């Protein structure tokens, strides 16, 4: 699931961005990191996503029971759009950690010096070296459907996101993690979902605390995930959004957060002049790589593109997409596309694997294949999202 980090760093100079929020916001530039030896795997991406949603809710814990501003955190495109991560500072003095920003979960956990089997290449948080760390006393454990897991203890410390300093944030210190987590480019996960699905009940997420501590002017965050073909990278803006990153106007869509996710309704799907599906539910998930559709929808889409079912959730598709029409979803009062150049995710010699797949769920998971083509503003308070095509 996670990838071996054999990387070269390419520093990018980021242009100053015009953000829609208070002018006191801070911005952080992050280099683009690529693993030139990595081979994208559609099969692994499908398995990772399905394992993630299978585990809800197979979690356990020992006790389950104003300055306005914006902060922006650029994110790194980890080789061919396989994973985006941002840098977060934890503790005093701070240690900088690469974390997977994930709207499909709500936990903030990362490798620590208490971990007996964490990857040797991972930067580890040391609670004994932070003057602002405090013990919590509770434990946490996450088990995924594919058998991978992470577990450890809870504490509180100062967490800084894009220049915004959250005090007394509950953090989950990993004491053990499965081998699938040990070699990836990120050292943990920062969940941006709703607090109803935190592993330990009652824990407030970083977004909760950004709002309650008055660190952001609006209860929103804008997400831009850049394509590797356009230089990669991307950015999260907490408390605002970047109007230069999208074209046209934002379409507002209500969110169903009853399961702790950013759930929306897809009214229909078209390819060219052909309607290929009626309505279905979907989750907007920055922590999932592919576009995972309900089985019947995926089958109809695959037929339209002449793709072949591999029996493992993936499809083989023609490597030449020049004649393909975009995959178009009707959402709210607008339509949003996955263009032809995003329909191929992985190429193995003369064989190509599609950027869409399927699972055993009756809902879709709109991962990075959709999100890197459409700018999204997440509003936790209403709740709602606003979407527009990328510029």
Curated annotation (Swiss-Prot):
Give the source's domain of life in one word: Eukaryota
Q: What is its EC number?
A: 3.4.23.21
- Leader sequence residues: 1-21
Cystine links in this protein are: 115-118, 319-352
From the UniProt record, list the reaction(s) this protein catalyses: Hydrolysis of proteins with broad specificity similar to that of pepsin A, preferring hydrophobic residues at P1 and P1'. Clots milk and activates trypsinogen. Does not cleave 4-Gln-|-His-5, but does cleave 10-His-|-Leu-11 and 12-Val-|-Glu-13 in B chain of insulin
Task: Locate the active site.
Answer: 102, 285
Q: Which UniProt keywords apply?
A: Aspartyl protease, Disulfide bond, Hydrolase, Protease, Signal, Zymogen
Q: Which family does it belong to?
A: Belongs to the peptidase A1 family.
> Can you say what this protein is called?
Rhizopuspepsin-2
């Amino acid at each position: 699931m996670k990838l071996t980090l054999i990387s070269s760093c390419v520093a990018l100079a980021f242009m100053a961005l015009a953000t829609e929020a208070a002018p006191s916001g801070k911005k952080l530039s992050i280099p683009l990191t690529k693993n030139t030896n990595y081979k994208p795997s559609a099969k692994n991406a499908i398995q990772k996503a399905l394992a993630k949603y299978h585990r809800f809710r197979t979690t356990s814990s020992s006790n389950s029971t104003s300055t306005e501003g914006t902060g922006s955190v650029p994110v790194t495109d980890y080789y061919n759009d396989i994973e985006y991560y941002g840098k977060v500072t934890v503790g005093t003095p701070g240690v900088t950690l690469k974390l997977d920003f994930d709207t499909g979960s709500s936990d903030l956990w990362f490798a620590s010096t208490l971990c007996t089997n964490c990857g040797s290449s991972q930067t580890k948080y040391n609670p004994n070296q932070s003057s602002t760390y405090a013990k919590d006393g509770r434990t946490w454990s996450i088990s995924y459907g594919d058998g991978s897991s992470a577990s450890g203890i809870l504490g509180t410390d100062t967490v800084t996101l894009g220049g915004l300093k959250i005090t007394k944030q509950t953090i989950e210190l990993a004491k053990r993690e499965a081998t699938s987590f040990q070699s990836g480019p990120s050292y943990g996960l920062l969940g941006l979902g709703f607090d109803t699905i935190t592993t330990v009940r009652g824990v407030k997420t970083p977004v909760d605390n950004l709002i309650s501590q008055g660190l952001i002017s609006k209860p929103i965050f804008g997400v831009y995930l850049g394509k590797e073909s356009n230089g990669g990278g991307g950015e999260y803006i907490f408390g605002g959004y970047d109007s230069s990153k999208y074209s046209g106007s934002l379409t507002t869509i209500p969110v169903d957060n009853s399961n702790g996710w950013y759930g929306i309704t897809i009214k229909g799907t078209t390819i060219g002049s052909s309607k290929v599906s009626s309505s279905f539910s979907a989750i907007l998930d920055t922590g999932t790589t592919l576009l995972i559709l309900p089985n019947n929808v995926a089958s109809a889409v695959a037929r339209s593109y002449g793709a072949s079912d591999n029996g493992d959730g993936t499809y083989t598709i023609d490597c030449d997409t020049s004649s393909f029409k975009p995959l178009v979803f009707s959402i709210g009062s607008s339509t949003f596309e996955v263009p032809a150049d995003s329909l191929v995710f992985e190429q193995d010699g003369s064989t190509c694997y599609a950027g869409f797949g399927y699972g055993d769920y009756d809902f879709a998971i709109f991962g990075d294949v959709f999100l890197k083509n459409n700018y999204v503003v997440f509003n936790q308070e209403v709740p709602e999202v606003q979407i527009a095509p990328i510029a």
